[in-house]
């Protein structure tokens, strides 16, 4: 339907304004007769411009004379013929006998279903003229022309009937004749092209080739009319030497229109005239070089001769050639350059208004890019043209068996084009494009015309597989790498191991000590007597320095000596006199001395000298001195001892320990600190924080491990070794402790290099200044004795400011004793590991300041706590080994002061009496008679095998679960990797013993449950307070050595599976023989408990808590049976809970928690029943 503003009646030719307006608006019209044509409505090669109001007065060349716009609507010729093509072409692929049943292009089928002419208008405006000749439309199939055009092309010269439809035989003969003629022409053409290619230039050759194709089309397209004289064809090239006046062309359109109205039909062209037209066209093209690879590029005959004659047709083609010279630039490049040139098109195309047949050709050209991108079209056209040329040369004799005809009456170029169109119909453009992605394009012949962008288009194989990333499922890859990444993400506190071979460390100086002359002149005898006087110093190592006697002999700086004088240190202590010269000589040292002997100063003073010798810290550099301690209290104590020296020496120290906010410690480290006093765990946190950018160990050259034995034994060995591995290997390492068990020496030597071992006063000895009292008392009399001791201490005025420290074994005991003492009027506080770090710090500060005189503590305060006024230490609960006793007693009597240590022993603590008696003997004090009797009694039991002697040292407490887990892991590995040959006899013996034990436990538990009073609601025979029986998972019978036993077990297994008997029958052990079964299991029947109790042990929240706490597996099995009903044979057993775990301890803890929940739920159900009203809510009157 015509758009607004158009009129159906043709306007006079002279009406330029109306003509131009209608021409513009025709751009937006989609004519009804063309609705099924599958091609665009526009008839011009010129770029389309959207209709805008501002374009009305501007110049716009006419597309076509408005007077001639309805010529194709002639009732006698066009309309009846167009009706044949107006049907829906999707209904059948057989649309007529004149079609060779060729496969239809998929894109044309799709394109005809929608009116996308407006969308295609933008795309075709950007397509270069060179690409239009290689359209998809031409490469897919030969689009059927209207009936009049077919008549003109296929009719004989003497047949003027325009509507005659030729038969299939005639058409086939005609095509074969064209093919043979084209073969002859091709040989001569190829030679001429090679000669021309040598003399032709690059870009000019390309444009001339395009012009040649455009100029050739009028002569090859269709036969000429017999009424058209041959002189018209001869004169065709002449008018195109220059440009035309648009007005003159518009005037010449009037007689042409009149002739069209009179003639009313097309006229066939005689054969004689066709020859002259061909020769003329050949002369025109003689001087134009061509590209050999593009010889067959014109894929469609474009010379459809209309009622205006051949001259008009060729004029339009030549004008298009001139436009091509201006606008064609190649494939991708043309889109960008044409966008700049399009606003001012040349006026050579202005006479397109006179040529309706040219508009039909434009339709053909425009149609080539519909529904696809220009890059794909160009690639498809190139590939199709190259393959077509090779195929035509190789298979010219095989085209439908029609290659024998030689008398071709039509022009050779026309035959070539028709054959090309037919061959290209057989190749789908999509297949051609996809094949180009996989196959390498055949090498192009070198000619003057080359596409500069051809290489850049090769990476457009975006649909190919060769460049795709290797997309592999996670499960198919390396699962170990994936798990390693996941584990790495979880280990937030891991610090990377440093490769010291690749690090460049600065050299540093270790040796600062120069032996004084008076010590150098000392003989060996004098040296031995001196060491004996200094509490019997024992040294072990090579070339150990002699002990100093005065601070001036240590080689210290003036600032350090001034601080020492201010602190009141008159002479070095025994450990200081021997350790300071050894450390300042650059040696690694192991120092063992009694408590309160000044070990802290012994390693601090050499460290200050060590740090001052090196260059100052720069921004973001780590510390130089690193001091690690096992407890937070000891860390704060060492940091406090450093402060007097730090101010004088202009150094900085940071105390880093757990429990305190890490952000404050990070801020202090970022400001820079030469010394870090830390606990191992917090140091690893700081090293791993912020991807290692908080601090580093690159400048650490001096490392101190204070109380090293406790640090290694408390489980800090992995952390300590990890930190030490990141410190440079040539560091200086110092270890100090009051006790040093022999099994710790091997661990200490891992971190030291040829150390000097210094032992002062013997290992693990209580200082002689401490008065030790050991009393054997019952549990109920210990508190009264404690009150007596405290009363005696504070009764005298001289002890008014004295402090008392009371040690207990457990946190609960500390809080209980605190409550009792507060009731008796003693102001006191407690400290243990269960309190927050800030509370622990404030409590120790208050205790030192005298805010309260009595402190109750566990062994956490046994080390590093230095209070000068501490006069009394009470071991309310006896220490369990010698080293702990030494450290507890060593809290008093420090720095030469006197003190008292009182220890309470109960009669059942014979095991601890041995170590206490040994400590008394080593310190030179008498062992009380009751204590000696306990020692003798215990040793007798050890000889009789009733008791096992305890080993000295910090063995640790509460590690049974860790041991069981370690053993379980070892057994699991043994089961996984065993060959079935080892250890069978021992395991069988263990199983027999366990089975006997289980039977005994069952009998015992049944007796206990029968005698114990039962809770209301608890089923008969179930004792929630009785012993928990944990079973070891039954071993698979397949492990038996005897083959007959294996056969028998297999038969029994088969029978059990077939009959389903014994699998889920009441009273049979649970089925936990699967691969996921734990090493231990236990069952708890809950079927007969009240509903509240059953819910307490089966709801997800409670079960999740137990699982998290114990690490077991809890499964509800069986079926619920009401009270009084029993499961029959073959039925599921009663509802029960199965608990599985890797250790017996874990299963026992889980069962104990489940029993507690059952008991609470049963009691709650009984209470709710008791509170419930007797009757209902309503009464029936």
Swiss-Prot record:
Broad EC category: hydrolase
Molecular function terms from GO: ATP binding; ATP hydrolysis activity; nucleic acid binding; RNA helicase activity
UniProt feature, compositional bias: Acidic residues: 359-375
Occurrences of domain Helicase C-terminal (ranges): 785-935
Matching InterPro entries: DEAD/DEAH_box_helicase_dom, Helicase_ATP-bd, Helicase_C-like, P-loop_NTPase, PRP5/DDX46/KHDC4_KH, RNA-helicase_DEAD-box_CS, RNA_helicase_DEAD_Q_motif
Catalytic reaction equation(s): ATP + H2O = ADP + phosphate + H(+)
Binding site for ATP: 593-600
Biased composition (Polar residues): 8-17, 285-294, 394-406
Domain Helicase ATP-binding: 580-758
UniProt keyword list: ATP-binding, Helicase, Hydrolase, mRNA processing, mRNA splicing, Nucleotide-binding, Nucleus
Compositional bias ranges of the Low complexity kind: 157-166, 222-243, 275-284
Entry EC no(s): 3.6.4.13
Motif (Q motif): 549-577
Residue ranges, compositional bias (Basic and acidic residues): 24-87, 94-155, 168-196, 384-393, 410-420, 958-981
GO biological process: mRNA processing; RNA splicing
Chain location of the short sequence motif DEAD box per the record: 706-709
Cytoplasm listed as a keyword: no
Membrane-spanning residues: none
Pfam families membership: DEAD, Helicase_C, KH_12
Annotated compartments: Nucleus
One Gene Ontology CC term in the entry: nucleus
Summary of the function given for this chain in its UniProt record: ATP-dependent RNA helicase involved spliceosome assembly and in nuclear splicing. Catalyzes an ATP-dependent conformational change of U2 snRNP. Bridges U1 and U2 snRNPs and enables stable U2 snRNP association with intron RNA.
UniProt remark on domains: The Q motif is unique to and characteristic of the DEAD box family of RNA helicases and controls ATP binding and hydrolysis.
Family: Belongs to the DEAD box helicase family. DDX46/PRP5 subfamily.
Protein name (Swiss-Prot/TrEMBL): Pre-mRNA-processing ATP-dependent RNA helicase prp5
Species for this entry: Aspergillus terreus (strain NIH 2624 / FGSC A1156)
């Amino acid at each position: 339907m015509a758009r607004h503003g158009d009129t159906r009646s043709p306007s006079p030719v002279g009406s330029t304004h109306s003509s131009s307006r209608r021409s513009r608006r025709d751009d937006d019209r989609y004519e009804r007769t063309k609705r099924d044509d599958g091609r665009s409505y526009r008839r011009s090669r010129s770029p389309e411009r959207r209709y805008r109001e501002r374009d009305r007065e501007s110049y716009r060349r006419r597309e076509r004379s408005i007077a001639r716009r309805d010529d194709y609507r002639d009732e006698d010729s066009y309309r009846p013929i167009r009706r044949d093509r107006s049907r829906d072409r999707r209904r059948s692929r057989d649309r007529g006998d004149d079609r060779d049943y060729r496969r239809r292009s998929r894109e044309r089928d799709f394109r005809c279903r929608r009116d996308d002419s407006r969308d295609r208008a933008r795309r075709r405006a950007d397509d270069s003229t060179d690409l239009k000749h290689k359209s998809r439309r031409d490469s897919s199939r030969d689009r059927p022309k209207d009936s009049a055009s077919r008549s003109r092309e296929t009719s004989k010269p003497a047949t003027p009937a325009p509507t005659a439809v030729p038969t299939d035989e005639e058409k086939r003969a005609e095509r074969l004749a064209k093919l043979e003629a084209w073969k002859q022409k091709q040989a001569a053409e190829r030679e001429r092209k090679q000669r021309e290619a040598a003399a032709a230039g690059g870009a000019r050759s390309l444009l001339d080739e395009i012009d040649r194709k455009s100029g050739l089309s009028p002569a090859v397209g269709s036969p000429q009319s017999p009424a058209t004289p041959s002189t018209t064809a001869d004169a065709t090239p002449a008018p195109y030497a220059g440009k035309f006046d648009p007005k003159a062309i518009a005037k010449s359109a009037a007689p042409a229109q009149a002739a069209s109205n009179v003639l009313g039909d097309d006229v066939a062209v005689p054969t004689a005239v066709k020859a002259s037209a061909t020769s003329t066209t050949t002369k025109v093209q003689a001087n134009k070089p061509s590209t050999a690879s593009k010889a067959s590029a014109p894929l469609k005959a474009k010379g459809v001769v209309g009622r205006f004659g051949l001259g008009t047709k060729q004029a339009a083609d030549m004008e298009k050639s001139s436009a091509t010279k201006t606008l064609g630039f190649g494939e991708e490049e043309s889109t960008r350059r044409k966008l700049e040139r399009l606003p001012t098109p040349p006026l050579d195309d202005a006479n397109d208004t006179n040529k309706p047949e040219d508009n039909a050709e434009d339709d053909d050209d425009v149609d080539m890019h519909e529904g696809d991108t220009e890059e794909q079209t160009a690639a498809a056209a190139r590939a199709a043209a190259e393959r077509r040329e090779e195929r035509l040369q190789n298979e010219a004799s095989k085209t439908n068996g029609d290659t024998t005809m030689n008398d071709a009456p039509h022009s050779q170029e026309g035959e070539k084009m028709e054959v090309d169109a037919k061959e290209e119909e057989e190749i789908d453009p999509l297949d051609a494009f996809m094949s180009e992605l996989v196959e390498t394009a055949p090498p192009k012949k070198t000619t003057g015309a080359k596409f500069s962008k051809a290489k850049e288009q090769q990476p457009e194989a975006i649909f190919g597989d060769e460049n795709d990333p290797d997309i592999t499922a996670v499960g198919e890859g390396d699962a170990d790498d994936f798990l390693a990444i996941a584990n790495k993400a979880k280990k937030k506190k891991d610090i990377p191991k440093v490769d010291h071979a690749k690090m460049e460390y600065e050299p540093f100086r270790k040796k600062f000590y120069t032996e004084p002359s008076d010590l150098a002149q000392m003989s060996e005898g004098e040296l031995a007597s001196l060491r004996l006087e200094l509490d019997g110093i024992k040294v072990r190592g090579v070339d150990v320095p002699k002990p100093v006697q005065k601070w001036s002999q240590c080689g210290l700086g003036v600032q350090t000596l001034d601080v020492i004088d201010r602190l009141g240190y008159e002479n070095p202590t025994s450990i200081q006199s021997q350790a300071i010269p050894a450390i300042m000589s650059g040696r690694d040292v192991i120092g063992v001395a009694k408590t309160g002997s000044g070990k802290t100063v012994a390693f601090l003073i050499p460290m200050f000298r060590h740090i001052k010798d090196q260059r100052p810290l720069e921004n973001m550099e780590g510390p130089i001195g690193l001091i690690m301690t096992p407890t937070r209290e000891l860390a704060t104590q060492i940091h406090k001892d450093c402060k007097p020296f730090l101010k004088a020496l202009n150094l900085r120290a940071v105390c880093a320990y757990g429990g305190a906010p890490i952000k404050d410690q990070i801020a202090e480290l970022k400001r820079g600190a030469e010394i870090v006093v830390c606990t191992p765990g917090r140091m690893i946190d700081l090293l791993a924080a912020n991807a290692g950018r908080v601090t580093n160990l690159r400048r650490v050259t001096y490392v101190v491990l204070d109380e090293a034995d406790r640090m290694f034994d408390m489980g800090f060995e992995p952390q300590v070794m990890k930190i030490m591995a990141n410190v440079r290997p040539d560091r200086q390492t110092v270890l100090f402790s009051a006790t040093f068990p022999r099994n710790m020496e091997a661990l200490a030597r891992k971190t030291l290099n040829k150390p000097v071992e210094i032992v002062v006063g013997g290992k693990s000895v209580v200082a002689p200044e401490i008065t030790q009292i050991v009393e054997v008392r019952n549990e109920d009399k210990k508190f009264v004795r404690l009150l007596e001791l405290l009363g005696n201490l504070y009764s005298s005025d001289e002890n008014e400011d004295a402090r008392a420290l009371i040690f207990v074994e457990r946190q609960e005991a500390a809080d209980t004793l605190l409550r009792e003492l507060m009731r008796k009027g003693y102001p006191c506080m407690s400290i243990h590991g269960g309190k927050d770090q800030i509370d622990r710090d404030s409590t120790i500060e208050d205790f030192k300041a005298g805010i309260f005189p009595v402190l109750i503590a566990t062994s956490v305060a046994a080390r590093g706590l230095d209070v000068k006024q501490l006069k009394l230490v009470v071991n309310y609960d006896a220490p369990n080994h010698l080293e702990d006793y030494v450290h507890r007693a060593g809290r008093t009597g420090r720095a030469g002061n006197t003190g008292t240590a009182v220890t309470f022993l109960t009669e059942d603590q014979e095991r601890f009496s041995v170590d206490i008696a040994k400590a008394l003997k080593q310190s030179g004090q008498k062992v009380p008679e009751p204590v000696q009797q306990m020692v003798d009694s215990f040793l007798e039991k050890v000889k009789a095998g009733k008791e096992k002697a305890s080993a000295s040292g910090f063995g640790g407490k509460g590690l049974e679960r860790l041991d069981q887990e370690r053993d379980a892991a070892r057994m699991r590995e043994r089961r996984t990797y065993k060959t079935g040959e080892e250890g069978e006899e021992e395991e069988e013996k263990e199983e027999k013993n366990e089975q006997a034990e289980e039977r005994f436990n069952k009998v015992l538990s049944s007796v206990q449950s029968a005698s114990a009073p039962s809770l209301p609601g608890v089923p008969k025979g179930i004792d929630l307070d009785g012993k928990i029986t944990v079973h070891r998972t039954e071993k698979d019978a397949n492990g038996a050595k005897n083959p007959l036993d294996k056969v028998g077990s297999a038969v029994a297994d088969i029978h059990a599976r077939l009959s389903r008997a014994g699998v889920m029958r009441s009273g049979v052990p649970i089925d936990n023989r699967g691969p996921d079964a734990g090493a231990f299991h236990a069952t708890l029947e809950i079927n007969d408990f009240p509903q509240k109790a059953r819910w307490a042990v089966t709801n997800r929240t409670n079960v999740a808590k137990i699982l998290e706490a114990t690490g077991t597996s809890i499964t509800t099995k069986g079926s619920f049976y009401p009270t009084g009903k029993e499961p029959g044979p073959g039925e599921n057993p009663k509802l029960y809970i199965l608990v599985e775990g890797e250790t017996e301890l874990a299963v026992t803890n889980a069962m104990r928690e489940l029993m507690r929940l059952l008991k609470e739920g049963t009691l709650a159900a009984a209470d709710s029943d008791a509170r419930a009203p007797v009757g209902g809510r309503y009464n029936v009157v």
